[in-house]
């Protein structure tokens, strides 16, 4: 059973009851997932940007968008319009597919993994987790990468509070640490 079907058939009715909501449409749901990677070295190394775009496309199944500098910062040696990262916004079936792979396959492959930090909510029910290396995703092989790069994964929910967001992610299978 896919994560999307599990959400519709068992998680949504359970959350409706647990959160004491009156309408099925009030139940929090995952709106989108943003996968973002900042590349400081992209200003000087164009191969890093190309490799990063390919990795993001492999991991998410969707072409990455190049993010560019809004203004020049001399200290970082960047000029306005220079590529400084890449991002992918996932919605719909691709989002659920990515979340399922991230929660069930990628997170358990992190070294010394004891769960994700339950304090990484933003106050509005959205959750962000930073990944230190792309090798946790089974689609990426160690032989094909030029260097280890991390990424930020933000799960945007329709939850009104952090408690609702946490309840939703726990039901989806997100392994929160106990501390």
From Swiss-Prot:
One GO-annotated biological process of the protein: translation
Annotated GO CC locations: ribonucleoprotein complex; ribosome
Protein name per its UniProtKB record: Large ribosomal subunit protein uL5
Keyword Ribonucleoprotein in record: yes
Keyword Cytoplasm in annotation: no
Subunit structure: Part of the 50S ribosomal subunit; part of the 5S rRNA/L5/L18/L25 subcomplex. Contacts the 5S rRNA and the P site tRNA. Forms a bridge to the 30S subunit in the 70S ribosome.
GO MF term (any one): rRNA binding
Keywords per UniProt: Ribonucleoprotein, Ribosomal protein, RNA-binding, rRNA-binding, tRNA-binding
Family listed: Belongs to the universal ribosomal protein uL5 family.
Pfam families according to UniProt: Ribosomal_L5 (PF00281), Ribosomal_L5_C (PF00673)
Superkingdom of the organism of origin: Bacteria
Cited function: This is one of the proteins that bind and probably mediate the attachment of the 5S RNA into the large ribosomal subunit, where it forms part of the central protuberance. In the 70S ribosome it contacts protein S13 of the 30S subunit (bridge B1b), connecting the 2 subunits; this bridge is implicated in subunit movement. Contacts the P site tRNA; the 5S rRNA and some of its associated proteins might help stabilize positioning of ribosome-bound tRNAs.
